[in-house]
Amino acid sequence: VSSTHGASGASAEIPAPGAPISHTEKGTQRFARTALALFAGGFATFALLYCVQPMMPMLSQAFGINAAQSSLILSLSTLTLAVGLLITGPISDAIGRKQVLVVSLLAAAVFTVGSALAPSWEGVLLMRALVGLALSGVAAVAMTYLSEEIHPHHLGLAMGLYIGGNAIGGMSGRLLSGVLVDYLSWHSVLGLMGGLALLAALLLWRFLPESRHFHPRPLRLRGLLQGYTLHFRDAGLPWLFLQGFLLMGSFVTLYNYIGYRLIAEPFHLSQTMIGLLAVLYLSGIYSSAQVGALADRFGRRRVFWLVIALMLAGVALTLFDRLPLVLLGMLLFTFGFFGAHSVASSWIGRRAQQARGQASSLYLFSYYLGSSIAGTLGGVFWHAAGWDGVGLFIASLLLIALAVALHLARLRPLPEPQAAH
């Protein structure tokens, strides 16, 4: 094993001949470099995806479209991202993790700039579809890289830090676009986001250490189908895939339509104020790492259902017409979501024993499919029954998620060191 790792410049000790290569542990330089690089990747992924969310009411006016149609600017991206995950995960199993991560983020940045230059709504949607497809290479591979390289005892923390990057990216993307769109055109805002993503891609290339535990798998269709079938035979993985759909579907639905609610009576918030609500993501940054660490300590099965219950409580508070209660509800909901996603993500990596890239891909396929389907379906509930309809829809998704989490808590864990409790 070389003492340097390609363009990343990360160093590692050279093991004795025949000695096993150790996993990366907390407190080492390699852990810090990995955390920084994937934090940047997670940041850019969510910033590029969700910077369009605060613009949706404005896009409705600019293009003469309704809320459900406007939501396509996000739903189409998450749909192509979901489909892309079924391709990019297996590609990374064949050619390596870092290469796929860096090229994917660079492509997403270029397509985001392309969306800013598109002359029509259809052109914007086409570019956004390509953004989602490119980001699939970051979304699946980052989780797999961590599962392979980080010591199992520190995987929950590392996954939490990565998802914290997602949270900060989602917050920053919404915050920047929500505020700037009052002063700049939406074209300019998207161009700016593309430039920031280019910087994140450079960070990822420079700091992410090359894999030490990656073993190439030939890219064969039969092997892919066998890998997917293998994961669905596991007693826990299919339920975790379903959780991705339910959790992300509820989360995106809330943030897609809360802007429409808060612009209208009795709140009358400005576009800038709605953009500033992205600071609620700070709770997700804290919860993703802390809940992940708690799951490492007390067990995922004991923590998972609690954070989902917290999301339900948050949705209930948003049904009131008092702004402080709505904001508190959004805070609890966001805290619970990122905590739950952190637990589920690390659980996938610990439970999948083979073809981990495909396991991550299946989880995130369900995750972003939930975003795409539920995120647009929520618009139907909004037009039919206002926020009460949206709240009922979200609560229904979360009640199913809670039942699934309680079922997972009763599953017999795999023997150590194969899976976490």
Name the predicted role of every residue range:
Residues 99-113, 302-316, 395:
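Structural signature of the two symmetry-related core transmembrane helices
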